[in-house]
């Protein structure tokens, strides 16, 4: 277990600590997404986002991290696909993510 990447440990600790409270775990959700992206795991970050972040407090932060990651890598296909699926707590936040595709 110790040989696993940091994001795996963070993801697993989130899974153990997560409840149904949309406010709880915001910082840990952001930390999980950051660690996944730092390890080049964009697909894993998206999976985690859609399973645990979207619709909860901090979802815009997580979505912008993922979208920004794709933009920095100049991966327009992944960015467009992600932005097309995102639906955040606030429409204005959703539009911020979509604006990165331009």
Q: Which stretches of residues belong to each language-model region?
A:
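Amphipathic alpha-helical repeat scaffolds
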Residues: 15, 30-34, 50, 64-68
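Alpha-helical repeat scaffolds
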Residues: 7-19, 41-54, 76-89
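Short coil/turn connectors between adjacent alpha-helices in alpha-solenoid helical repeat scaffolds
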Residues: 1, 74-77
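Generic helix N-cap/helix-start motif at coil->alpha-helix transitions
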Residues: 7, 21-31, 56-65, 90-101
